[in-house]
Amino acid sequence: MLLTELSQILFAQIATPAVATDNLEFSFWKIMFHGGAFAKIVMVTVLLLGIFSLYLFFERFFFIKRLSSKTDSNFMNNIEDFIKAGKIEAASDYCKTQNSPEGRILEKGISRLGRPVSDIVSAMEAQAQVEVANMEKNLNLLAVVPSIAPMLGLLGTVIGMIIAFFNLSHATGSFSPKTLSEGIYTALGQTAVGLAVAIPANFCYNILLTRIDKFVLKAQNMSGEFLDLINKPL
């Protein structure tokens, strides 16, 4: 019954002469908040998720960037000079003054000089894990946004479609295709907004992961250089 009525409406619309639409202006902002109370709640929630994801991204991005810029460019060369000169305490103090992830990792290794190499490696790996965890703080919250935002948008779309077809099934007298189309494009707008929030959030999340991966690679190379240094004949 419903499909028959929809077909009649569609054929009637095709048979009707086209109406001039030159004065119509597409406004996605109006579409976003065109629906009922539930649609507005979904839209506001998704937009808040978008703002939240941007805050997390910039906070983590500049935090990681600030940490990466603290280490001296000649850090490893200076450490090598201290070690070769036998100034272990000075090397440890130099690492502390850096106040950087690299400095803290090497300081753990220097503080265990004289012990088995496995102890030195374990100490540096443990500190590296602490530094990575510090960089990844709240990153799991950002990872959730690309999953939740489209689902909320899809929920809004499904509810909107249900409402649109419910109104169609209970319509009396002649029914305008405009009424149905408004319900459909309003509902689809929910999914569009969800995707518009999820895609940049996913992109931002992967940018942060890439920067953290670069730090991990840098820390591994630095640890390897340090182990080569302490095992090198003086």
Language model features by range: what are they?
Residues 2, 7-75:
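Hydrophobic membrane-targeting segments
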Residues 36, 54, 91, 106, ...:
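Residue-level signature of catalytic and energy-coupling elements of molecular machines
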Residues 39-56, 146-150, 156, 197-201:
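Alpha-helical transmembrane segments of integral membrane proteins
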